[in-house]
Amino acid sequence: MTKYILFFLFVLLNLYNCEKEDKVKIYDVILNQGKTNEFNVKKGEEFALRLFCSPGTNSLILLNKKENQDSLTYIKSDYEIVHYEGEELGLGRMGYLYYYFKATSETEEPKLIKFTDAYTYLQKENPTPTEIVKINVN
């Protein structure tokens, strides 16, 4: 009986996640690739970046203007961050996080969301981002 209840809860959880993904566009970013990812979003639209971290990256950092600290993850962005969710990133294992944003750009220029890993961030005063995501708001 317990197996059936657990299975039912698992199915409900997956349905909930599918519904959420249907409402928000999700863009995948694989960290430590050293390349710029570019995405187009509409003004006012909510979108998500699904960040995949390679083993050895125990947290990731977004380098931009606003600062909001939570657990091991440091978030800095020009965008309104709605919320984030995902697997807690542990040293030496694969992890992922979803960051949900709302495109609130007032200018025509693309916005950059810059990432680096915690090790790079802590070793340097002005860390260079290892990843850049370019967001074009139409």
Locations of the language-model features?
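Sec-dependent N-terminal signal peptides
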Residues: 4-13
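Glycine-centered tight-turn and secondary-structure capping sites
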Residues: 101-116
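C-terminal motif of bacterial Sec signal peptides marking the signal peptidase cleavage site
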Residues: 15-17
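Short, solvent-exposed loop/linker segments at beta-strand-coil boundaries, enriched for Pro/Gly
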Residues: 57-58, 63-83
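Short, exposed beta-strand-loop hairpins at the edges of beta-sheets
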Residues: 114-128
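N-terminal edge beta-strand
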Residues: 21-49, 54
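Interdomain boundary/hinge segments at the C-termini of tandem beta-sandwich modules
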Residues: 134-137
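Aromatic sugar-binding surface patches on proteins
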Residues: 90-99
